[in-house]
Structures are given as structure tokens and as C-alpha cells.
Amino acid sequence: MPEIGTPPLPPEPKSLNDWTLFQNRAEFKTAEFFYIKNQMPAGQIYHLLDLWDIIAGDPETIGSTFVPIILRSDKTTVSVATGNNEYYPLYLLIGNVHNNVRRAHRDALVVIGFLAMPKTTKKHADDPKFRKFCRQLFHSSLSRILASLQPGMSKPDIAKFRDGHFWRVIYGLGPYIADYEEQVLLACIVRFWCPRCCSHRDNLDATSVLRCREYHEALFEVGTYGELWTEFGIVADLIPFTNNFPRADIHETMAPDILHQVIKGAFKDHLVDWVEKYLVLTHGRTEADRILDDIDHRIVAVASFSGLRRFLQGRGFKQWMGDDSKALMKVYIPAIEGHVPTEVVRTFRALLEFCYLVRQNTITERTLDEIQDAVSRFHQYREVFKTSGVIPMFSLPRQHSLMHYAHVIRLFGAPNGLCSSITESKHIKAVKEPWRRSSKYKALGQMLVTNQYLSQLAAARVDFESHGMLKGTCLSAELEALGMLDNPDVPNDEDPNDPPPNQASNLEDGDDLMIDHGPTVLQAHTRLARTVPSCTETKRARSVLALADELHLPSLPALIRRFLYEQTRPDNTLDALSSYLRVLSYDVPLAACPRYEGKVSVFNSACSRFHAPSDLSGIGGMRVEHIRSCPMWRNEFSCHDCVFVNTGSDTEGIRGLDVARVRAFFSFNYAGTVYPCAIVCWFDVIGGSPDPETGMWVVRPAYYANHAPTHTIIHAVEIASADTIYCAAHLIPIYSNQFLPLDITLHVSYDAFRAYYVNKYVDHHTFEIAS
């Protein structure tokens, strides 16, 4: 028994082969990948482990790496003016690539072929035999293209990995990304039936068993062609291409498609159209058109926001693109509120919440419960469209697909890495641009060569960068080779802020929104613009008093003094529980506060860099958005954006943030310290929970007792843990049931209303922090 105070014995040396809790290093790395790096849902882990158990059952495949093959085929038009030229590319990527790599539009997705599109005369176009030929040709082509992988699905193939090592690999068919029309073709079923379950086409939302290869083959044994067509929706004389490959079932491999099933399908093609039909049935054509014009006006009057597409004519345009539907989702609920029943608003809310939940980068079991709750509420509130006579029944395949998302997410993980929007953007680089560079005569061969060269260039760049061969400039490399370069630390001839080659920018409407290719940083950071606007060009103030006059804010000198008092206190602590952190210094006489009325540098914008992996972002999930505060934007009107301000609270989401509007960004030097600042006016949060109809928090402008807006000066950059700008916020007026005056435009949207919604639908990051 050691005496009290005796130091403990040193720990026994640990064996380098002691992987306690795990059998070996491979098991530890697998668990780390599942639960930390990739954060797979439990169902997906079990599914993958089941596949490994199947592979491990063959002695020849033990120890092999399983590589799921993800496919996507989608027709695209390269030119309408020259004869409606269409191509049918087939894309491939592997399931071992992380989701962030897929969504950052790097080179994980490649074109592996172009499918045939048979032509015939109008006389035979609708002939059943020709249609059957086209369908079976589609499956036969897929089988032929993938035939080279078939041997590696049973016996290991030797492949060289990125780390330079050779590994034994077993391939398998994974998710197939397809819209509904192509899912019908893939699953060999009749249109208006579900490709995943056996629910009857007249009542798709009824509970039913899932389709599978074994179930279909059993039906083939007992049913006739006509019975299978009418009672089960099966096209019995077609053979799915997956039947030629081991461990493959076409009904299990079809991935969810957020873009076509939810955004363009359930939202735009269904609910938006139903709103117009409801208004016509309820008010008649003339009054309905008047209401629709007001809805369009409300949409046009929404304030600008980085990445938010502007609808200059409302939503009344002929050709809808996927980005148009995404943009309309962000502003549509406040636009219709007051013109439609509460049940309609709640229907849209449930659908939008479903869409944003399944679009999240990380989905947990709690998220799956929220997804199921959103589906239940959607089914409950959409009944208003049936009881009002807008639609007789809801047996719609794309709406019905919402019921399968939770199951498919458990199989394949977060759907945002498998959405067809990934290949929609790839069409530009892989099909349309190569076609434009071709001679237009027998262009397909030329396009294939172009894609081959692009892939080789991308691979060469990765190799050269990994060996440090692209540092410096071409001239510096030559001088260094000749021994004529004294200083090797020369600038690079490539802009580090430029996106990698072949990467889509996906900027909407030219707004200042960009992805960041730097490493992951969980703490948000805001910085002012790099340059000060020219005094002669913008006539911005250059002193405190001049800035006070420009902003019509006589209290600015006093605000700066109180700001300096807080910053120069030796015991400066910020009370995170205060409604406004800034009011602490108002108990101090102004005479006790430092005075500064000297020079200032005024900036038109600032940029916020934060972690937002659910939105368009870089490999590390980082995103940069610009916050504007300028007297003249796009040579039209002034623009002063709203922001979320970090209050220093430990509370997650909007309860730990304040909402404010930036009047100006500026900086000044006091006692040798530069203070980057923002003048903001505040909003008060109304109520202790979001609005029950829209699901959005409500705020109103804050005023002093003398009815003057509450202005404060805060840090514009991350200096302390509180009282700093986090990221941009977007507010939408609460229009109620009043028609919007014609003189209200987006430029006065933040000045003309008494209350606003904090728009949680403006992007996925805001949805996560403002729900």
C-alpha cells in the first residue's frame, strides 16, 4: 500500500499492436470514417456492412475494398437554333468520394459514354414495338458500357489509389440518379406508378410493400402480361440492365432526386399551379389576376441578398429553369400570405422544411424524425386543395416520392450529394462547351476526345501540384533551372482565389457570392473591403462629423465615444444576457467617454466567411458572402443589408443572435489601435417562438423612447467573442392581406414596413440557424 503523497507509477508502455476496443488498425480507421469523417446514418452503415458480409462470404474477396458505382444519365440540348441537337450523356462517380467533393463540382464526376437516341418517322414514333425497342436499347447499352466492370464485381481487381498504394477492389452498382421519367424507364414500370413500391397508381400514398427483383420475378411466374401491367404497373417484356450484374437490384439503387421530385415537381409544377387554380375558383378570373399581380409585386419588392435571384417581372415567365424554382421557394410564402387560407401557407411551409431538411449536409436520426414530421404535416394541410375542388386526388408520383426519402437516406446518406443538380451543371463542361468547340459535323467523336483531354489535364494538375511543380511563375521556374534566381520566394502566376479548372461557379444574378477553397474554420470571420472608395467617385465622408452628416445621424460622435469607452475599459466584459449589449455604457456620463472626431475610412461592403457545408461551398465547406452598405448600388439606389450579430450567447441558432441593419462600414485609428466598425440599427424579436403559419421568426425595428431608431456602433470583424457580425440576414416584409402600393420597390423594402419575417428559406445555412 503506497504512502499518501507518493507519485503514481509511470504507465506501462503500450504495445504498437494494441488496438484495444478494435481488432486492428483497419477496424479503427473504418469506425473513424463512418462516425467522424463521413458521419453516416446508422442504416447506411448497416447496409454497407451487409454488402461487405456478402463480399466476405467469398474467400477470394476477403480484404478487398468495396467501390460503389454511382450512375446518372440525362438528356440535354446543346443548340435549339441549329436543329434541336440532343445528347444523352452517361455520368459516373464512385461512392468512396466524400460528399463535399461531389458537391464542390470537382472532377469526381466524369462522362463515360453517350447513350443512343433512335430516330424514326412520325408514323412509327408511337408504335409500341418502336417504343419497346428504345427502352430495351437503353438497358442493353448500359449493360454494354458497364461490362468492363463486371469481372471486378466478383473477383478483386487491382487498382492504384491516390496514396500510391495498390489495393484489391470489388466493384458494385450503387445509387442511380434519375428524374421520374427516367426512373420509370430504369425500373421497367408503367408511368404514374411508383418505381420503389407496389402502391396502386390510383392511391400511391397507401402503405405497400417495396418492389424488388425477387418479387417481380415471382409475379412473372403467375401473372400474364396484361395483369402485370394493369394490377402492378410492371412492363413484363423488358429486362433491367441490373439483372446482368451481381448484388444489383434496380428498385433499390434509384437515388432520391430533390431537384425534379421536390423543387420542380411538388413545389413548382404542383403547389404553385394549384394556388392559381384556387384563386380562380374562389374569386373568378378577373379578381384572381388582380391578386396574382399583387403576388408578383410582392416578389419583386423583396430586398436583395447575395445569391438571391431577382424576379423583375414576378413569377410570370414562360420557361422555368431549376434555378428559377429554387429562387422562388425562398420568397414565395410571404408573397401569398393573406391571399390564401392558412392551410395553404402551412402546406408550403411543410414542403419547404422537408426540402431544406433533406438538403442538409449532415442528417441524423433526429433530422429523419423531422423529415417524417414535415411529410405528415404536408399530407395533412394539402387536403385544402382537394376540399376546395382544385384537384380531385393526390396520387402523384413525384409527391409520393417524399414518403420514401427517410428509407433511401438510410441506404445512401445525405441526398444533396446525389441530386441531379450535380449533373445539370456538368452538362455545361462535359457536353455543351465541347460541342461548341467542335466542327458541328459528327461532333460526338470530337466531344469525347475533348473530354478525354480535359480529364488528363485535370489529373496532370493534381499530380504537378502534389509535387510542388506549379509554385512561382513560368519565368521564375526557368530562371531557377538556369541558376539565375536569387530569391525563390516569388509570387505565383495563378490567383489563389480563382476556382479550380472545370468548376462551376453557380452564381445567381451576378451577385457577390463565392465559395471558399480554404480549410474548414468553424468560427465565422468578417472583414471590411480591401480598398476605400475614391472620394471623388463616391463622395464618401472622410471624418466623423462628415459621416454623421452623410448618414443624417447627429448622434454619431456620441456613439463613437461610447463605443471607445467599452473598448478601452480594462475590465471590459460583455453581458451576453442583455437584450442589447450596447446599452451597458449608457449609464456612464458621456463626459467620461473618450473623444474622437478625427479621420475615418468608409467602406461600401464587407465579406463574411463562415462554415456552410449545406450550401454551395468549397471542399472544406467554407462560403463567402458580401454584405453591402453603400449610397449607390448598381447605379440605382442605396443598399444597406441586414446581418446577424453574435451576442456571445451559448444558445444555438437565432436565440443567440441579434438582427440588425448596417448603415455604414468604417474604420478609424485611436491611440494606435485600428477599429473596424459598423453602424447598425436594431430589430426586436417579437414573441418567443417562430410564426406558426410560416415557421419564420418575426422582428420589428427597435426605437428609443423618443421614437428614434436604436443605432449602435459594433465591431465589423471578429475581435471578441461577442458583439460582432456573424453573417448576412434576409428580411421579408409581412404584407398581411393588404395590396402592396405600386411605389414600393426592393430599394425601400427595409424602410416601409412595421414588421418583417427573418427569411430562413433564403439559403440552407440560414435555415439551420433561424429555424
Residue positions per predicted region:
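N-terminal regions that are enriched for targeting/export leaders
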Residues: M1-D53
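Surface-exposed beta-strand-to-loop junctions
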Residues: F22-T30, G113-P128, L308-L312, K330, ...
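Charged (Asp/Glu and Lys/Arg) segments that form or flank catalytic channels of large polymer-
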Residues: I55-L71, T121-L142, L146-P334
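Terminal interaction-prone segments of large eukaryotic proteins
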Residues: I55-P59, F245, K264-S771
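Core residues of folded domains in eukaryotic genome-function proteins
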Residues: T65-L71, E86-L90, A108-V111, V190, ...
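Acidic, metal-ligating active-site segments
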Residues: V78-K119, P676
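Short helix/loop capping segments that flank catalytic or ligand/cofactor-binding pockets
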Residues: S79-T82, L90, N100-R103, D202-T207, ...
